Curated annotation (Swiss-Prot):
Pfam families per UniProt: KOW, ribosomal_L24
Presence of the UniProt keyword RNA-binding in the record: yes
Lineage: Bacteria, Bacillati, Actinomycetota, Actinomycetes, Streptosporangiales
Full protein name: Large ribosomal subunit protein uL24
Originating organism: Thermobifida fusca (strain YX)
Assembly description: Part of the 50S ribosomal subunit.
Matches recorded under CDD domains: KOW_RPL26
SMART domains the record matches: KOW
Gene giving rise to this polypeptide: rplX
């Protein structure tokens, strides 16, 4: 998966189109990412009688498919590619500028 934890991304499709945020968590097996402040859902939490905890409604960030986000570079969306350095290490590059990410 080309998007990693800590990357700054923009949502390019869906109800939050145009929103930007940092990737909090990448889920490569599911091809999804969790982005800060994007795709917010409300989850009802059950009350716990034994612990004395009240029921509440919690707002959480739901995972969004990786095809619906693009990496941001200098405020503009870009695609990600890979190159090998002279020493053989694989690095991510920006398809827009060709620079190493």
């Amino acid at each position: 998966m080309k998007i990693k934890k800590g990357d700054e991304v923009i949502v390019i499709a869906g109800k939050d189109k145009g929103a930007t945020g940092k990737v909090k968590k990448a889920l490569p097996k599911e091809q999804r990412v969790i982005v800060e402040g994007v795709n917010l859902i409300k989850k009802h939490k059950k009350a716990n009688q034994a612990g004395g905890q009240q029921g509440e409604v919690v707002t959480l960030e739901a995972p969004i498919h990786v095809s619906n986000v693009a990496l941001l570079e200098d405020g503009r969306p870009t695609r990600v590619g890979y190159r090998f350095k002279e020493d053989g290490t694989k690095v991510r590059i920006s398809r827009r500028t060709g620079k190493e990410i």
